[in-house]
């Protein structure tokens, strides 16, 4: 846990999933402090919109203003709810919207934590363009190293005149005034052909490897299991290309597409609808934190390309949580397949959780591993 003192309230904040006590990662950063400083002793007219509030630092601090927390991460929503409870703040003080929803009209203040990808930032700025006014105070923040010329140009292009502040604690702010500059329409998704198939893959703004098949997924697809039955999971599904291939290779199976990103799940659904509509009755789509809340002993197999970062931080906490949830939800003799960078040494992590692990395939960068849920372990 970490403590954030600001002009609104003193907060105790924790990351979600929680990090270990040996190398704890902080649940807020200097950019959060810097943004809140801009609103000290300031009357806030109209709705407050907060975008990409990773662990709820801004939402908790501004809870008395009934803010809207907008983002593309269910884990961030869970983190914010947990930190509201931790600080004795009514959860209903914050209204949660995902990035595909319509934003509230005529906000008084918009606070943006600049996301990792320009594509998501552009989608969010275009959504804001429909609701902000020239009186809306628009402030964005990030580590100074993460604000580039391209970031500023995007604010200018979509919203209007943009300036930056001096760096403070290695953070920098962007101030923007809306003046409705001319702007061409843009498609909601990017599409590309998947080589070796007749499929066209559609990706919303925040989907990993948005403009083509990433090399880890490409390697994984060469070693996917075939002729499985029952329910199998594409965990952390992204655009659903793994799950789509599983539907094709396992005609007797149902595939459950799971991701914490609403845009990823929307992309997966769109890709099944457009490429294998006949398989929709064998498909389920779920926005979730790994397999939290899913009944145990449900699935015959789980397939996963786990992330090794959360927001801007390198961490295996999300992957570790995925592995534990996968084991709980697998049937006895159910199988977990993963692809990962070789240097992450997930072989020993899986062996610790499952009691076994087998290398299915390897190259100079990636490894495909399989672990089986055995009846003798609980």
Swiss-Prot record:
Class in the EC hierarchy, top level: transferase
InterPro entries for this protein: DNA_methylase_N6_adenine_CS, rRNA_m2G-MeTrfase_RlmG, RsmC/RlmG, SAM-dependent_MTases_sf, Small_mtfrase_dom
Keywords: Cytoplasm, Methyltransferase, rRNA processing, S-adenosyl-L-methionine, Transferase
Protein location: Cytoplasm
Pfam families noted in UniProt: MTS
GO molecular function, one term: 23S rRNA (guanine(1835)-N(2))-methyltransferase activity
Catalytic activity: guanosine(1835) in 23S rRNA + S-adenosyl-L-methionine = N(2)-methylguanosine(1835) in 23S rRNA + S-adenosyl-L-homocysteine + H(+)
GO CC entries: cytoplasm
Primary residence: cytoplasm
UniProt superkingdom: Bacteria
HAMAP family with a match to the protein in the record: 23SrRNA_methyltr_G (MF_01859)
Family: Belongs to the methyltransferase superfamily. RlmG family.
Biological role stated in the UniProt entry: Specifically methylates the guanine in position 1835 (m2G1835) of 23S rRNA.
Name of the featured protein: Ribosomal RNA large subunit methyltransferase G
Organism: Shigella flexneri serotype 5b (strain 8401)
Gene behind the chain: rlmG
């Amino acid at each position: 846990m970490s403590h954030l003192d600001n002009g609104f309230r003193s907060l105790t904040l924790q990351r979600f999933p929680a990090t270990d006590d040996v190398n704890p990662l902080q649940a807020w950063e200097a950019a959060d402090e810097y943004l809140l400083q801009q609103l000290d002793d300031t009357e806030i007219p109209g709705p407050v919109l907060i975008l990409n509030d990773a662990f709820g630092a801004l939402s908790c601090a501004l809870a008395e203003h009934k803010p809207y927390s907008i983002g593309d991460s269910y884990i961030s929503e869970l983190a914010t709810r947990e930190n509201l409870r931790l600080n004795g703040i009514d959860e209903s003080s914050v209204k949660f919207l995902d990035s595909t929803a319509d934003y509230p009209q005529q906000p008084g203040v918009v606070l943006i934590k600049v996301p990792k990808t320009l594509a998501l930032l552009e989608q969010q700025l275009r959504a804001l363009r429909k609701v902000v006014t020239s009186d809306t105070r628009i402030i964005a923040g990030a580590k100074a190293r993460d604000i580039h010329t391209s970031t500023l140009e995007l604010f200018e292009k979509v919203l209007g005149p943009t300036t930056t502040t001096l760096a403070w604690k290695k953070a920098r702010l962007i101030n923007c005034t809306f003046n409705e500059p001319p702007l061409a329409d843009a498609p909601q998704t990017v599409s590309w052909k998947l080589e070796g198939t007749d499929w066209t893959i559609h990706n919303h703004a925040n989907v990993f490897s948005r403009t083509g098949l990433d090399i880890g997924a490409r390697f994984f697809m060469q070693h996917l299991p075939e002729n499985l039955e029952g329910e199998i999971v594409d965990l952390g599904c992204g655009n659903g290309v793994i799950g789509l291939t599983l539907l094709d290779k396992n005609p007797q199976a149902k595939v459950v597409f799971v991701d914490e990103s609403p845009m990823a799940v929307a992309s997966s659904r769109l890709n099944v609808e457009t490429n294998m509509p006949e398989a929709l009755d064998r498909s389920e789509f779920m926005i979730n934190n790994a397999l939290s809340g899913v009944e145990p002993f449900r699935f015959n197999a789980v397939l996963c390309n786990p992330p090794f970062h959360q927001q801007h931080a390198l961490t295996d906490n999300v992957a570790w949580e995925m592995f534990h949830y996968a084991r709980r939800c697998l049937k006895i003799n159910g199988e977990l397949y993963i692809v990962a960078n070789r240097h992450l040494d997930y072989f020993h992590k899986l062996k610790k959780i499952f009691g076994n692990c087998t290398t299915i395939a390897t190259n100079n960068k990636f490894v495909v591993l399989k672990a089986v849920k055995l009846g003798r372990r609980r």
